[in-house]
Structures are given as structure tokens and as C-alpha cells.
């Protein structure tokens, strides 16, 4: 009986890993054993940073909103509080896009937030 080898599967597995290691430097690019560990590490970082990206964008939106709200005489936290009291349900991404691309519209929203805050203080 002929000895069964896994050569086709092994070759395709090695090829896949070496293809993923394209662009790596030195032995990490062409030697399977080092490529495999480098690719695994790269994939771990990739997974981790995909999760981090969500928080990074949220921080960016908050920074943009903070700057835009200070132009209208509000801090970021007072802007968000005023929007909640005014019943305006816009998320931070949409608000930051509005602050950049539609400053007049953002000014209207900020004014409504300010009025809601003043109404809460008086009443």
C-alpha cells in the first residue's frame, strides 16, 4: 500500500502563511517557521487594534465636539447634558460630522441645548 502523505495540505498551509507574511522583513518573509510566529503575532495585534479603533474614533468625535461646543459657549459635558434635556437624540459621530460640515446646523443644535439647560436651571 502506498504511504499517504499530507504534502498537498502542508504545502497549501505553508503557502497561505507565507502569503500572509508578504511585506515582512528578512527571514520573517520567506522562512515558514519564523513567518508563522510573526503572522500569528500580527494577527493578534490586528484583532486587538480592531477593538481599539472603536474607542479611538469615539475619542476623536468627543474632541471635535468639545472644540465646536466651546465656540458656542458650552463645555462638552454641558452640551451633551443640554441635548439630553432638549430631547435631541443625535449620536456623537453625527454631531461631530455636523460640526465640521454644517456649522450653522450645529449652531442651532447648540443653541437648543443651551436653552434647555437654562430652562432646567430656572424651572
UniProtKB/Swiss-Prot annotation:
Transmembrane segments: none annotated. Gene3D superfamilies: 6.10.160.10, Ribosomal protein L20. Keywords: Ribonucleoprotein, Ribosomal protein, RNA-binding, rRNA-binding. GO terms for cellular component: cytosolic large ribosomal subunit. GO terms for biological process: ribosomal large subunit assembly; translation. The keyword Repressor does not apply. Pfam families: Ribosomal_L20 (PF00453). It comes from the Bacteria. One of its GO terms (molecular function) is rRNA binding. InterPro entries: Ribosomal_bL20, RIBOSOMAL_L20_CS, Ribosomal_protein_bL20_C. Belongs to the bacterial ribosomal protein bL20 family. Binds directly to 23S ribosomal RNA and is necessary for the in vitro assembly process of the 50S ribosomal subunit. It is not involved in the protein synthesizing functions of that subunit. This is Large ribosomal subunit protein bL20. It comes from Chlamydia trachomatis serovar D (strain ATCC VR-885 / DSM 19411 / UW-3/Cx). The lineage of its organism: Bacteria, Pseudomonadati, Chlamydiota, Chlamydiia, Chlamydiales.
Amino acid at each position: 500500500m502506498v504511504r499517504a502523505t499530507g504534502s498537498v495540505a502542508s504545502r497549501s498551509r505553508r503557502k497561505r502563511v507565507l502569503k500572509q507574511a508578504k511585506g515582512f522583513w528578512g527571514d520573517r518573509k520567506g522562512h515558514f517557521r519564523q513567518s508563522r510566529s510573526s503572522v500569528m503575532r500580527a494577527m493578534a495585534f490586528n484583532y486587538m487594534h480592531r477593538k481599539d479603533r472603536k474607542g479611538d474614533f469615539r475619542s476623536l468625535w468627543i474632541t471635535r465636539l468639545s472644540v465646536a461646543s466651546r465656540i458656542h459657549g458650552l463645555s462638552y459635558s454641558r452640551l451633551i447634558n443640554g441635548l439630553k434635556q432638549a430631547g435631541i437624540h443625535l449620536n456623537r459621530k453625527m454631531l461631530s460630522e455636523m460640526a465640521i460640515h454644517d456649522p450653522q446646523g450645529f449652531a442651532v443644535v447648540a443653541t437648543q441645548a443651551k436653552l434647555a439647560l437654562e430652562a432646567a436651571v430656572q424651572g
